[in-house]
């Protein structure tokens, strides 16, 4: 899935769109996506000016965006202006490696369970072979007025 397809699926735009490409997707099972991290990211201006590091919360957000793409594919729906995909919870978040300009984040997200409109995912983000972040994510899709 290229960036044009991602833009049709996710409502996020610059500077918060954190998925550049989907490398693999298995409906109802898993997704593998990537984010190219460059020095041009706006968060590096303040985090930290003399030693730029990607904020951990944005690694979690990148995994959540990949999870949303998997959820939409699994349900066979295309989101619209009346559908919002929310975080419902994060458990066991661990940050194991700093992510710096020039790194490529690979997000591997697995759908663990789907029940009553709540999705539970297991996500691992890597740079090369090294784990940068891992967490369990809970998300829900809601219709808004």
From Swiss-Prot:
Superkingdom of source: Bacteria
Recorded GO MF terms: (3R)-hydroxyacyl-[acyl-carrier-protein] dehydratase activity
Active site location: 47
A Gene Ontology biological process term: fatty acid biosynthetic process
Compartment(s) of residence: Cytoplasm
Catalysed conversion reaction: a (3R)-hydroxyacyl-[ACP] = a (2E)-enoyl-[ACP] + H2O
GO cellular component: cytoplasm; membrane
E.C. designation(s): 4.2.1.59
Keywords, comma-separated and alphabetical: Cytoplasm, Lipid A biosynthesis, Lipid biosynthesis, Lipid metabolism, Lyase
Similarity field: Belongs to the thioester dehydratase family. FabZ subfamily.
Biological role: Involved in unsaturated fatty acids biosynthesis. Catalyzes the dehydration of short chain beta-hydroxyacyl-ACPs and long chain saturated and unsaturated beta-hydroxyacyl-ACPs.
Protein name from the UniProt record: 3-hydroxyacyl-[acyl-carrier-protein] dehydratase FabZ
Source organism: Polaromonas sp. (strain JS666 / ATCC BAA-500)
Lineage start: Bacteria, Pseudomonadati, Pseudomonadota, Betaproteobacteria, Burkholderiales
